[in-house]
UniProtKB/Swiss-Prot annotation:
Residues involved in L-glutamate binding: 539, 541, 546, 717-718, 759
Record disease entry: Developmental and epileptic encephalopathy 46: A form of epileptic encephalopathy, a heterogeneous group of severe early-onset epilepsies characterized by refractory seizures, neurodevelopmental impairment, and poor prognosis. Development is normal prior to seizure onset, after which cognitive and motor delays become apparent.
Stretches with biased composition (Gly residues): 1074-1089
Topological type in the membrane: Multi-pass membrane protein
Residue numbers bearing the Omega-N-methylarginine modification: 1316
Highest classification ranks of the organism: Eukaryota, Metazoa, Chordata, Craniata, Vertebrata
GO cellular-component term (any): NMDA selective glutamate receptor complex
Protein name: Glutamate receptor ionotropic, NMDA 2D
Function: Component of N-methyl-D-aspartate (NMDA) receptors (NMDARs) that function as heterotetrameric, ligand-gated cation channels with high calcium permeability and voltage-dependent block by Mg(2+). Participates in synaptic plasticity for learning and memory formation. Channel activation requires binding of the neurotransmitter L-glutamate to the GluN2 subunit, glycine or D-serine binding to the GluN1 subunit, plus membrane depolarization to eliminate channel inhibition by Mg(2+). NMDARs mediate simultaneously the potasium efflux and the influx of calcium and sodium.
Organism whose genome encodes this protein: Homo sapiens
Length: 1336
């Protein structure tokens, strides 16, 4: 018996007695006796199916209450269709092995559908045991309290182990919300090696790494409670953090807190948070009346925080009923789906039924009971648990300071002020309740950050109403968390830090500053007066009435009363573009100045010797080019407005000076107009101005039209001031008062309010921050009734003196000024720079008008000097070397500017070449009409082509010109240079052979001339009918072509005349090229008549200058000659005679003269006259070959010779034979001392020869020729002429050339080109010069 009853003997009877007691008391019969039995289908109350739930308690504390729980829980939990039958069982064993054995024995002897478990041991091993049993038997097990609320390992597969408590992760989440709410971002984690400490540290890492809050984790301390108090104290002091999160077993908490107290890490300034179910609720079972003591009896430190379930103060029956309700609601769902309650496992040693548990698990995951959500996650914890934050007070009781509902934390204010002394616990002597009122920029209220749910660092938490109760009633509104910042909030934070107090900030409910209504004060003043608040701060104005009931600090902001209005947009006048100048200036400008200056310019131009008066006086064509007064006005008008319109510029120097001064005047006029126009074109903004509150607009608003509408915010100091001083004004403005400042500003912008009267500090801020800067305070922020903002305190408060001293310190340290720049500044400024825009009057523009008057006076002086020089002084200037030097210097300056290449050194003259006999060109048909060429395009082109480069063309001409003259484009050369010309053709129509290659020639001088004619040329045929036509030369002789070096183009409306030159000197006769006109050929007349060697260039013989000056006899000579004779002379002008010299010798000409008087002349030569008889004139062979000397219209002799057909003039007395007589007949008197003469220089003596031809009785005395474009060096080769007798009759005079080499056959006079301008001595054409434009 001993062996059988040895050690197990005492346990056997006890176990048997327990099982018998359970069997006798069990409400679950093994088998139903009948249809109405308990076990049959119809068992239970009223046909409801029985639901057996085991209530298992572990610990001796539950023995007294376990027997009474069954009926109470069954009555609390009622489920339709189920008969809930709870059975309470108490387990004495506390170790894990004993607990497992007892539970397995219990389940094997009972048929239950669920288990509700609670223990008071808080042993961490209980949860894994229950989780294993649920997975093994598929029974739903609900843990409601104790150590079962901690899962140390992942749940077993198929387990339905559910927990109503909070997990470590959920507790840490709530704790971090509290830390974030109070800006406690720096902390340290303290843990022991208790089960679950690694999960605790990992959860902390997850929460801090993924948060937007800047957490400062100082590290983790892993303590060994058995190491001794000194070691623990040293470890706790090693980390300087005032927030500490503790995770340990309940037995390990006592040595940790003793070491912290020894190290001075508890009490004021330090906060401890306990994490884990074994520490939650403090000592004991957490009952409401149980003191929070450690297991050893030591008290917990004050200020300790913990997180518990919301029902932590509920009794045992209510906690158990919640667990039974979870099982009942899940069973009801099973019965609804399957129609019966499935049989669950009751044997712990049976085969695992995990697959069945997985299918039943989902019925218990989403439960709702008693208006509470019991939804569980995969770990078996509630998804949305209802938690509370409890704190240990000084009276050693737990206080609920916050709640956690639906993932939202709500805290009771205050715990400790964020901006008081750091983490000081609540001290009634140093804690203040502060009331404030929202009013920008002094107090700005904003919601909390939507992401983090906290206030940013420059703001503080503030609530909407005051709540002093610890446990507010359920129907009371919860305080809404807001964030306050602004100018006054920054001052409050500085005061709290300087003086050393904590505060609780809240907003007044009525939103007023303070006013006494029916004997009761409201607003912030009422909160302080009735002692609901210790202090009131904000835009609170100090006045006499308020100072009677409360004390005010020194003012920290100067303010008063100001008036704000809105800018109204103006309109732009239709005549705004005329407003920059006064009407007098406009009249002076366009009526007087423009007209007077235009008439002045026209008069100067008309009377100018170089102006358009010659065209008016001598123009043969009606409607010719004239500078009229209309053109003068048009020119000045275009200069005023900078319009690029076609205008005709004056030519006179005086007129040009006047136009230049007018242009300068126009620049000043237009610039002043443009600069002043912007001020008048903008929309002028209208701002109503008042002088103060006593202004007539405020005192008598009905007299205005429309009446002025103004108001203020009632119940403030502004309304009090107006009511006391201006009662009539107050009674009028009551209808326009606004409830808030923001609404008043909206009414101002909408035009429903004309003026708003309020505190100056607030209005100045609103004006600076207004969008669009449409609001402005009158008088640049003018303040009336100056006062200030102060802090309201109780009468006789002990805080007044410290606050006054602190505010004075802030003012002295410029902290207040810094805050004003931060909060009270804006982008809109009232002190706008006033732009004084006024019309420019005569006084403003007098200077430019004076300038015009001075310019007109100077122009008169220039005008007089110009006429004096032209008519008097220029004839008194004799030929001097100074003039030659000036002309040469002018040419050199032009050559530098035009990048003219330096001429190569002179080469020795080549031997003279024999001249071929001239061949008569074949007659050609009359030329067709030439295209019209504008007058300004008629030009003389001078260039040199490379010998042997082929026939001349348009491209070659342009290239040759630009190679020599550079990139300049002289007026009128555009048409001549760019036109391509066809290759010359012979009589048979075949192209002529290119000329033979010749040695390179020296570059020509840099000069050209553009001749402008006034009338179209007359047809050449029929001008001299008395001249017979010469015989045609052989056609085959038109092969030798010389390159044209100069082309003289006249502006003709008639077809151009054919070539008429009797020699082909390409340098002295520029139009003798193939393209110059007509077919030509080479060959000689008379078989092989030897040509005399020319004496020019290499050996210049004495040769007088040919007098080719036009005279009025041109028309008479043309009429005397028949058109047939002139037509017969046309073929004599061809260009197929080669120039006898290989190259031009000597430097370029150094002096140039006008060529406008030479437009109708061409030169001939004695030696190249065709050997035929008939009327002819004597020519100097060398002087006739001058380069730019035009050929004469005709060579004139006496009418006797003309009447005789082919004439033979008598020889002079100094000559013998026929030839000297011919030369004498064409001579002219050498000297006329009483008249100005043209100078002819000779190599021997440079004695000038002056003569002027005048018309006399029986003859013509022609005026001297104007100086030509020939250089004086070429003219110097002509010797002084011998005396000649004066000819009579309308004849052309010519110098005799006494040199022997100048003898030759006579030449009939060339084709006459009618002169369009009349007498060249009284006419000036439009000649343009490249290096010098002068008239001598």
């Amino acid at each position: 018996m001993r062996g059988a009853g040895g050690p197990r003997g005492p346990r056997g009877p006890a176990k048997m007695l327990l099982l018998l007691a359970l069997a006798c008391a069990s409400p679950f019969p093994e088998e139903a006796p009948g249809p109405g039995g308990a076990g049959g289908p119809g068992g239970g109350l009223g046909g409801a199916r029985p639901l057996n739930v085991a209530l298992v308690f572990s610990g001796p504390a539950y023995a007294a209450e376990a027997a009474r729980l069954g009926p109470a829980v069954a009555a609390a939990v009622r489920s339709p269709g189920l008969d809930v039958r709870p059975v309470a069982l108490v387990l004495n064993g506390s170790d894990p092995r004993s607990l497992v054995l007892q539970l397995c024995d219990l389940l094997s002897g009972l048929r239950v559908h669920g288990v509700v478990f609670e223990d008071d041991s808080r042993a961490p091993a209980v949860a894994p045991i229950l989780d294993f049993l649920s997975a093994q038997t598929s029974l739903p097990i609900v843990a409601v309290h104790g150590g079962a609320a901690l899962v140390l390992t992942p749940k077993e597969k198929g387990s339905t182990f559910l927990q109503l408590g909070s997990s470590t992760e959920q507790q840490l989440q709530v704790i971090f919300e509290v830390l974030e709410e109070y800006d406690w971002t720096s902390f340290v984690a303290v843990t022991t090696r208790a089960p679950g400490h690694r999960a605790f540290l990992s959860y902390i890492e997850v929460l801090t790494d993924g948060s937007l809050v800047g957490w400062e984790h100082r590290g983790a301390l892993t303590l060994d409670p058995g190491a001794g108090e000194a070691v623990l104290s040293a470890q706790l002091r090693s980390v300087s953090a005032q927030i500490r999160l503790l995770f340990c077993a309940r037995e390990e908490a006592e040595p940790v807190f003793r070491a912290a107290e020894e190290a001075g890490l508890t009490g004021s300034g330090y906060v401890w948070f306990m994490v884990g179910p074994q520490l939650a609720g403090g000592g004991g079972s957490g009952a409401p009346g149980e003191p929070p003591l450690l297991p050893g009896g030591a008290p917990l430190p004050a200020g300790l925080f913990a997180v518990r379930s919301a029902g932590w103060r509920d009794d045992l029956a209510r906690r158990v009923a919640a667990g039974v309700a979870v099982v009942a609601r899940g069973a009801q769902a099973l019965l609804r789906d399957y129609g019966f309650l499935p049989e669950l496992g009751h044997d712990c040693r049976a085969q695992n039924r995990t697959h069945r548990g997985e299918s039943l698990h989902r019925y218990f995951m989403n439960i709702t009971w008693d208006n509470r959500d019991y939804s569980f996650n995969e770990d078996g914890f509630l998804v949305n648990p209802s938690l509370v934050v409890i704190s240990l007070t000084r009276d050693r009781t737990w206080e609920v300071v916050g709640s956690w509902e639906q993932q939202t934390l709500r805290l009771k204010y205050p715990l400790w002020s964020r901006y008081g002394r750091f983490l000081q616990p609540v001290d009634d002597t140093q804690h203040l309740t502060v009331a404030t009122l929202e009013e920008r920029p002094f107090v700005i209220v904003e919601p909390a950050d939507p992401i983090s749910g906290t206030c940013i660092r420059d703001s503080v938490p503030c609530r909407s109403q005051l709540n002093r109760t610890h446990s507010p009633p359920p129907d009371a509104p919860r305080p809404e968390k807001r964030c306050c910042k602004g100018f006054c909030i920054d001052i409050l934070k500085r005061l709290a830090h300087t003086i050393g107090f904590s505060y609780d900030l809240y907003l007044v409910t009525n939103g007023k500053h303070g006013k006494k209504i029916d004997g009761v004060w409201n607003g912030m003043i009422g909160e302080v007066f009735y002692q609901r608040a210790d202090m009131a701060i904000g835009s609170l104005t100090i006045n006499e009435e308020r100072s009677e009931i409360v004390d005010f600090s020194v003012p920290f902001v100067e303010t008063g009363i100001s008036v704000m209005v809105a800018r109204s947009n103006g309109t732009v006048s239709p005549s705004a573009f005329l407003e920059p100048y006064s009407p007098a200036v406009w009249v002076m400008m366009f009526v007087m100045c423009l007209t007077v200056v235009a008439v002045t310019v026209f008069i100067f131009e008309y009377l100018s010797p170089v102006g358009y008066n010659r065209s008016l006086a001598t123009g043969k064509r009606p409607g010719g080019s004239t500078f009229t007064i209309g053109k003068s006005i048009w020119l000045l008008w275009a200069l005023v407005f900078n319009n690029s319109v076609p205008v005709e510029n004056p030519r006179g120097t005086t007129s040009k000076i006047m136009v230049l001064v007018w242009a300068f005047f126009a620049v000043i006029f237009l610039a002043s107009y443009t600069a002043n126009l912007a001020a008048f074109m903008i929309q002028e903004e209208y701002v109503d101005t008042v002088s103060g509150l006593s202004d007539r607009k405020f005192q008598r608003p009905q007299e205005q039209y429309p009446p002025l509408k103004f108001g203020t915010v009632p119940n403030g100091s502004t309304e009090k001031n107006i009511r006391s001083n201006y009662p009539d004004m107050h009674s009028y403005m009551v209808r326009y008062n606004q409830p808030r400042v923001e609404e008043a500003l909206t009414q101002l912008k909408a035009g429903k309010l004309d003026a708003f009267i309020y505190d100056a500090a607030v209005l100045n801020y609103m004006a600076r921050k207004d969008e669009g800067c449409k609001l402005v305070t009158i008088g640049s922020g003018k303040v009336f009734a100056t006062t200030g903002y102060g802090i309201a305190l109780h009468k006789g408060s002990r805080w007044k003196r410290p606050i006054d001293l602190a505010l004075l310190q802030f003012l002295g340290d410029d902290e207040i000024e810094m805050l004003e720049r931060l909060w009270l500044s804006g982008i809109c400024h009232n002190d706008k720079i006033e732009v004084m825009s006024s019309k420019l009057d005569i006084d403003n523009m007098a200077g430019v008008f004076y300038m015009l008057l001075v310019a007109m006076g100077l122009s008169l002086l220039v005008f007089a000097w110009e006429h004096l020089v032209y008519w008097r002084l220029r004839h008194c200037l004799g030929p001097t070397h100074r003039m030659d030097f000036l002309l040469a210097f002018s040419r050199g300056m032009y050559s530098c500017c035009s990048a003219e290449a330096a001429p190569p050194p002179a080469k020795p003259p080549p031997p003279p070449q024999p001249l071929p006999s001239p061949a008569y060109p074949a007659p050609r048909p009359a030329p067709g009409p030439a295209p019209f060429v504008p007058r300004e395009r008629a030009s003389v082109d001078r260039w040199r082509r490379t010998k042997g480069a082929g026939p001349p063309g348009g491209a070659g001409l342009a290239d040759g010109f630009h190679r020599y003259y550079g990139p300049i484009e002289p007026q009128g050369l555009g048409l001549g240079l760019g036109e391509a010309r066809a290759a010359p053709r012979g009589a048979a129509g075949r192209p002529l052979s290119p000329p033979a290659a010749q040695p390179p020639q020296k570059p020509p001088p840099s000069y050209f001339a553009i001749v402008r004619d006034k009338e179209p040329a007359e047809p050449p045929a029929g001008a001299f009918p008395g001249f017979p036509s010469p015989p045609a030369p052989p056609a085959a002789a038109a092969t030798a072509v010389g390159p044209p070096l100069c082309r003289l183009a006249f502006e003709d409306e008639s077809p151009p005349a054919p070539a008429r030159w009797p020699r082909s000197d390409p340098e002295s006769q520029p139009l003798l090229g193939p393209g110059a006109g007509g077919a030509g050929g080479t060959g000689g007349a008379g078989g092989g008549a030897p040509a005399a060697p020319p004496p020019c260039r290499a050996a210049p013989p004495p040769c007088p200058y040919l007098d080719l000056e036009p005279s009025p006899s041109d028309s008479e000579d043309s009429e005397s000659l028949g058109g047939a004779s002139l037509g017969g002379l046309e073929p004599w002008w061809f260009a197929d005679f080669p120039y006898p010299y290989a190259e031009r010798l000597g430097p370029p000409p150094g002096r140039y003269w006008s060529v406008d008087k030479l437009g109708g002349w061409r030169a001939g030569s004695w030696d190249y006259l065709p050997p035929r008889s008939g009327p002819a004139a004597w020519h100097c062979r060398h002087c006739a070959s001058l380069e730019l000397l035009p050929p004469p219209r005709h060579l004139s002799c006496s009418h006797d010779g003309l009447d005789g057909g082919w004439w033979a003039p008598p020889p002079p007395p100094w000559a013998a034979g026929p030839l000297p007589r011919r030369r004498a007949r064409c001579g002219c008197p050498r000297s006329h001392p009483h008249r100005p003469r043209a100078s002819h220089r000779t190599p021997a003596a440079a004695a000038p020869h002056h003569h002027r031809h005048r018309r006399a009785a029986g003859g013509w005395d022609l005026p001297p020729p104007a100086p030509t474009s020939r250089s004086l060096e070429d003219l110097s080769s002509c010797p002084r002429a011998a005396p000649a007798r004066r000819l009579t009759g309308p004849s052309r005079h010519a110098r005799r050339c006494p040199h022997a080499a100048h003898w030759g056959p006579p030449l009939p006079t060339a084709s006459h080109r009618r002169h369009r301008g009349g007498d060249l001595g009284t006419r000036r054409g439009s000649a343009h010069f490249s290096s010098l434009e002068s008239e001598v």
